[in-house]
């Protein structure tokens, strides 16, 4: 089997490559069909997914069985001012990959986000795959456009929405909180935005389980359990052992101090229903996955040997 991983140097792409290389994750083995797979990792500048001709030629030349698209513009605030860049990475790129995948018969896994939802109609019920999206930010809007293009142009697709992603590699909320705690000693974090922290290990594991099936469609894949950013930050500080305190604040208080920040959904908790009912759900409780992260994390070096 031949697999192309786009955005291979990001948090998720790096973890997917690691699991394909080692044949397993912290959770368990990868599918037997993927053992000894030929893996083609690509990222900018080798492949610009927003360039149709480049994508079409690359996919036709390599003829993969599976394309896993981890490439995206994920800077939520940056998307508000860099509209064209966000559209190219989050909407146009997935369209190009979907068209190329359809032409060559490849399966396409496209990673999306909880930010496609408005988060305004909470009621305490996690949003499943049937919930109607309503993005409130440029990031969410462009990611939703990418989903629609994938659905339209590639029949053999898996759209996988995730949330609050962190990993041993790259920049993420966990590392930001640890570093800020060390530097400032006191942090303020919003306590009225709720969702599902997701370890990239879990997300990569489930994507690899999915991509060898014919169970095409839309999936949610996040850590089990729901918390606020404040709860998440408090658990990060506790597990890290950093001498710092975390105080709660409202979204309005945060916005007053950071007026240029994009709106975030207050309730973006997702339900992994389709995952449970098809390939099964091995995703860990968010606290267990975070504790495992701190057991294995080696600071700037990524993961301990």
Across the structure, where does each feature detected by a protein language model lie?
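N-terminal Rossmann NAD(P)H-binding glycine-rich loop of SDR-like oxidoreductase domains
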Residues: 1-26
């Amino acid at each position: 089997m031949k697999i192309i991983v786009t955005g291979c140097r990001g948090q998720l792409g790096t973890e997917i490559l690691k699991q394909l290389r080692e044949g397993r994750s912290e959770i368990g083995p990868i599918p037997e069909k993927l053992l000894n797979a030929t893996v083609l990792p690509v990222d900018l500048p080798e492949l610009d997914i927003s360039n149709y001709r480049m994508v079409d030629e690359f996919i036709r030349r390599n003829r993969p069985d599976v394309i896993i698209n981890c490439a995206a513009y994920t800077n939520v605030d940056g998307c508000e001012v860099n509209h064209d860049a966000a559209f190219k990475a989050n909407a146009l790129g997935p369209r190009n990959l979907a068209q190329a995948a359809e032409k060559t018969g490849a399966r396409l896994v496209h990673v999306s986000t909880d930010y496609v939802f408005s988060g305004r109609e909470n009621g305490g019920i996690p949003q499943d795959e049937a919930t109607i999206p309503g993005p409130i930010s440029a990031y969410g809007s462009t990611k939703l456009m990418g989903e629609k293009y994938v659905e339209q142009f590639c029949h053999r697709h898996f759209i996988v929405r995730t949330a609050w992603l962190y990993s041993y590699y790259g920049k993420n909320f966990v590392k930001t909180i640890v570093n800020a705690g060390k530097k400032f000693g006191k942090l303020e974090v919003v306590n009225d935005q709720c969702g599902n922290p997701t370890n990239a290990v879990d997300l990569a594991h489930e994507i690899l389980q999915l991509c060898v099936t014919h169970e095409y469609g839309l999936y949610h894949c996040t850590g089990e359990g729901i918390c606020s950013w404040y709860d998440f930050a408090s658990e990060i500080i506790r597990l890290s052992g950093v001498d710092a305190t975390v105080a709660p604040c409202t979204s309005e208080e945060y916005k007053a101090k950071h007026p240029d920040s994009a709106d975030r959904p207050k309730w973006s908790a997702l339900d992994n229903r389709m995952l449970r009912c098809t390939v099964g759900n091995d995703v860990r409780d968010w606290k267990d996955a975070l504790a495992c992260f701190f057991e294995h994390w080696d600071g700037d070096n990524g993961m301990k040997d």
